[in-house]
C-alpha cells in the first residue's frame, strides 16, 4: 500500500478489515487471502496509528517510511501494490512498482 490517507481510510481500510474477518472467495480459485504486508509513506505516522487502532482487525504489516519508502517496500517482493497517494504523486511510485514487475492498482 502506497499512501495511507483519506482514500485508504474510505476505501481500502474497510476492504482489508472485511476480508480479514469474513474472507474472500472466488469460485475459480477458492478462498483468496488479501492482506497488507507493507505500507509506504513519507512519515509512517498514519500507518503506525492504523496499526495501533486495528489490532485484531487485520494482521500486522511493516511500515516503510522516508523518501525511499516505495523502494524499501519493493525489496520485500509484494505480489501487488496499490498507489493511493494524491494524484500528483502517482507517477514516480507507479513507475518504480511496474519496473519491479509488481502488479499495480492506481487509485
Task: Go through each PLM region and give its residues.
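N-terminal glycine-/serine-/threonine-rich beta1-alpha1-beta2 phosphate-ribose binding loop
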Residues: 1-102
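Hydrophobic residues in well-ordered beta-strands that form the structural core
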Residues: 106-107
Amino acid at each position: 500500500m502506497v499512501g495511507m490517507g483519506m482514500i485508504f481510510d474510505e476505501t481500502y481500510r474497510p476492504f482489508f478489515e472485511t476480508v480479514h474477518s469474513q474472507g474472500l472467495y472466488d469460485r475459480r480459485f477458492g478462498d483468496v487471502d488479501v492482506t497488507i504486508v507493507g505500507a509506504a509513506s513519507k512519515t509512517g505516522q498514519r500507518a503506525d496509528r492504523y496499526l495501533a487502532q486495528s489490532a485484531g482487525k487485520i494482521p500486522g504489516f511493516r511500515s516503510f517510511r522516508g523518501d525511499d519508502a516505495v523502494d524499501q517496500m519493493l525489496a520485500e517482493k509484494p505480489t501487488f501494490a496499490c498507489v493511493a497517494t494524491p494524484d500528483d504523486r502517482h507517477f514516480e511510485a507507479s513507475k518504480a512498482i511496474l519496473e519491479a514487475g509488481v502488479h499495480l492498482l492506481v487509485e
